[in-house]
From Swiss-Prot:
Pfam families: U-box (PF04564)
Ranges where the U-box domain occurs: 24-103
Enzyme class (EC, first level): transferase
Pathway involvement of the protein, from the record: Protein modification; protein ubiquitination
GO process annotations (BP): protein ubiquitination
Gene name linked to the record: PUB43
Alphabetical list of PROSITE patterns matching this protein: ARM_REPEAT, U_BOX
Taxon lineage: Eukaryota, Viridiplantae, Streptophyta, Embryophyta, Tracheophyta
Protein purpose: Functions as an E3 ubiquitin ligase.
The ARM repeat ranges on this chain: 136-175, 178-217, 220-261, 263-302, 303-342, 344-388, 399-438, 444-484, 489-528
Protein name, as recorded: U-box domain-containing protein 43
Length: 811
């Protein structure tokens, strides 16, 4: 008898002689070279028998060593090296092996129950694996339903080792055996195996993946595996794991590849981040498969990076589907394109791939095979997504005659389509126009088309829509975008209709949990309307708009109204709207009374200190200028008592009566609330601080507000003294010297001339050559009136003699 040995990594057949109930191995069955039971015995000319593979290897080694071919047993040289198959011996061995396998399987069946000792179970599982491997070698198979079910029962063991070996055994049993796979697929066994992907140690996970890989080779089982909750996400997770061994990762990947035969599995993979199979089917599948995949791509949640990948991979194919005459293909393609067009990166790729021409054609085409309205709405949505990325659309042709998206003809068609469709598509078309008007390069084209088509009235009417929030929002955003270019037309439209102005006010004043985009857009729209439009201002006053706006401003300033995203733009709009009432003070008593009642000067003084909010500071300074200009009309001049007889006789010797509380500037009794006095409101310091602002649009209004203290009819000397006390002289001179804009220079020259009327200031400033140079430049190059004022300023510092005036003096 030959001893036991190792063969092919598993326990050899000769070990069976030590197991109870197993036939002993006959010595004739053993190959002298391998010491293993032979599978393909062959005989030499001298009658010695060997395993074919082993003796062929022996002969090869003899040749490589330059030795004559000899018998490994007798060491004698062979004259003939032909190998004769030992058919009878092979049949005998196979019969012996089949008999022993049957006995081993019977013992295994008896050992495979959960109450048995772990060692017995493990031995039984090992024997089953050996038998199955041997059967594979002789290209036979065995299907023992009872045994397969007993092995699956071992998956319920409390022992990790038993469960792992049971999985390894199942993998060997089902390999290439469809019947065994079908038995494993019964009941919840596959679900249990899937569970092991996350709950077992590393070896157990590898064994579970190996079983699933074998099962997934059966097309009939692909859907069953994929239908188990968590199966695909766990497999996808394993493929990207950095901690799993390479074998587990590779088997998981191969399993998923097999599962791709089911479209539902492909969808599940896409949901869980493995999108490539879906894209591959969309590119290479049948027309029906392409439609199915495109439909699913349209509803799939995608992050922005994935949208770019999708656009790169299948963007062209989707556009081709969109161009077909098949309505289901077009619908599926539009849905997918809608999904991936909402990110700037993917939208640019789609533009470069040529999406715009067919998209525009689908929107405007009327005739056979035209898109139904519901799909035109999707087309409009895609177009809205694309135009909101801020692309140079004037360089992308979309029509047969090289029209672009911002060509007047195309924009007018969009406007016409907006008027002739339902609310859903109207909202999308308006969103397209919002995108186009958000770009400085294209807004002028849209404004021109709106003017030429007289569409402003119909656009304003959308403001009153209450049944469709998206439509109303899009219309307000569009009107806001065009308002800087069409403020007069918008004001006329709002004046000539009933309800729209009130609707905008209602939106602004609505009590919402946070500030909405619609509120910010509505406020921005009203803020752009002509500020000197008295009719519009008084309508706002009568409708209670200003009171509501004050409430909103105070609420935001006190932190009672929040909305980080839109708070700044909303507040800017509110302050600008409120400031317009100060333009009505000279003509409307009601406006003056409202400003007094609500103490608007104090509110604007508070807003003046809104650091880093230029538009709010600009509007507040402008409002304070208007309020201050009205102070001289509101100041109460005290009545002096009539002089006594003696005083009237000796008036040259008497002193004028002293009245306490007289304003130095307005020579009357002032207050910030009732007469809008900047001095009483302690506004001078705050306005002077803004003169150093980097934004010219803030400096100008601040300078204008300060200049109201130097107006004719006021005590200019006292006004200059107040500005000097606030250290405002130098900043004013700096505005003159910097010469940022012509308007700032005109205002600065006017103020400097008044300041230089103070003799000691004139002496000091006269020594500053740069100031003199700036005044000389204004004297030579500014407009006529400013040149006159600059001449007077130069006289104050003795740079022009009094007898050398060349202009008519002005008061």
């Amino acid at each position: 008898m030959a001893g036991s040995g190792s063969w092919d990594g598993s326990q050899s057949d000769n070990s069976s002689q030590f197991e109870p109930g197993i036939d002993n191995i006959y010595e004739a069955f053993i190959c002298p070279l391998t010491k293993q039971v032979m599978h393909n015995p062959v005989t030499l000319e001298n009658g010695q028998t060997f395993e074919r593979e082993a003796i062929e290897k022996w002969f090869q080694e003899c040749r490589e060593n330059g030795q004559p071919l000899s018998c490994p047993i007798t060491s004698k040289e062979l004259s003939i090296t032909d190998l004769s198959p030992s058919i009878a011996l092979r049949n005998t061995i196979e019969e012996w092996r089949a008999r022993n396998d049957a006995l081993k399987l019977d013992i295994a069946r008896q050992s495979l129950y959960l109450g048995n000792a772990e060692t017995n179970i493990l031995l039984a599982l090992k024997n089953v694996r050996e038998i199955c491997r041997n059967i594979r070698k002789i290209r036979q198979r065995v299907c023992n339903p009872q045994l397969v079910r007993l092995i699956t029962d071992m998956l319920k063991s409390s022992s990790h080792e038993v469960r792992c070996k049971a999985l390894q055994t199942l993998q060997v049993v089902v390999e290439g055996d469809e019947e065994s796979k079908a038995i494993v697929a019964e009941g919840d066994t596959v679900r249990t195996i899937v569970k092991f992907l996350s709950q077992e140690p590393s070896k157990g996970r590898e064994a579970a993946v190996s079983v699933l890989f074998e099962l997934s080779k059966s097309e009939a089982l692909c859907e069953k595996i994929g239908s188990i909750h968590g199966a695909i996400i766990l497999l996808v997770g394993l493929t990207s794991s950095k901690s799993e061994n390479v074998s587990t990762v590779e088997k998981a990947d191969k399993t998923l590849t097999n599962l791709e035969r089911s479209e539902e599995n492909v969808r599940q993979m896409a949901i869980n981040g493995r999108l490539q199979p879906l894209l591959a089917k969309l590119l290479e599948g049948s027309p029906e498969t392409k439609v199915s995949m495109a439909f699913y791509l349209g509803v799939l949640a995608l992050n922005n990076d994935v949208k770019v990948i999708v656009a790169q991979t299948v963007g062209s194919s989707l556009i081709d589907l969109m161009r077909t005459r098949d309505m289901s293909q077009r619908e599926a393609a539009l849905g997918a394109l809608n999904n991936i067009s909402s990110f700037e990166g993917s939208a640019k790729l789609l533009i470069n791939t040529g999406i715009l021409p067919p998209l525009i054609k689908d929107l405007f085409y009327v005739g056979p095979n035209q898109l139904p309205i519901r799909l035109k709405e999707v087309s409009a949505t895609i177009l809205a997504n694309i135009v909101n990325i801020g692309y140079d659309f004037d360089k992308v042709p979309v029509g047969p005659h090289h029209q672009t998206l911002v060509s007047e003809e195309i924009v007018e068609n969009l406007l016409q389509l907006t008027s002739n469709t339902g609310p859903e598509i109207q909202g999308k078309l308006l969103a397209v126009l919002v995108g186009l008007t958000s770009c400085p390069n294209s807004v002028i084209n849209v404004v021109s088309a709106i003017r030429n088509s007289a569409a402003i009235i119909s656009l304003v009417q959308f403001v009153e829509i209450h049944e469709n929030d998206d439509l109303r929002l899009a219309s307000i955003k569009l009107l806001h975008n065009i308002s800087p270019h069409m403020s007069e037309e918008l004001a006329n439209a709002l004046r000539s209709t009933v309800g729209q102005l009130g609707s905008l006010v209602s939106i602004i004043s609505e009590n919402t949990p946070t500030i909405t985009e619609e509120q910010a857009a509505a406020a921005g729209l009203l803020a752009e309307l002509p500020e000197r439009d008295l009719v519009l201002t008084m309508r706002l006053l009568r409708e209670g708009a200003f009171e509501k706006i004050i409430s909103k401003i105070v609420g935001i300033r006190q932190g009672e109204i929040r909305g980080i995203r839109f708070e700044r733009t909303f507040l800017e709009g509110l302050v600008s709207i409120l400031a317009r009432i100060t333009f009505a003070l000279t003509k409307e008593t009601d406006a003056t009374l409202f400003c007094c009642e609500k103490n608007l000067p104090s509110l604007f003084l508070d807003l003046l200190q809104s650091n880093s909010q230029d538009n709010i500071q600009r509007a507040s300074a402008t409002a304070l200028e208007n309020l201050s200009l009205e102070s001289k009309n509101l100041t109460k001049i005290p009545e002096l008592p009539p002089p006594t007889y003696c005083v009237s006789i000796f008036s040259c010797l008497s002193k004028p009566p002293v009245v306490l509380g007289i304003c130095k500037i307005h020579q009357g009794i002032c207050s910030v609330r009732e007469s809008f006095c900047l001095v009483e409101g302690q506004a001078v310091d705050k306005l002077v601080d803004l003169l150093d602002h980097e934004n010219d649009k803030v400096v100008g209004p601040a300078l204008a507000a300060l200049s109201t203290l130097l107006e004719d009819g006021l005590d200019v000397v006292q006004g200059v003294r107040l500005i000097d006390e606030a250290d405002g002289i130098t900043p004013i001179l700096n505005v003159l010297l910097e010469n940022r804009t012509e308007n700032l220079r005109i205002r600065a020259v006017w103020m400097v001339e008044r300041i230089l009327r103070i003799e000691e200031i004139a002496r000091e400033v006269g020594e500053e050559q740069n100031v003199t140079a700036a005044l000389v430049d204004a004297f030579q190059n500014a407009d006529f009136r400013t040149r006159q004022i600059a001449e007077k300023a130069l006289r104050h510092i003795d740079k022009i003699p009094n007898f050398s005036g060349i202009f008519t003096n002005i008061g």
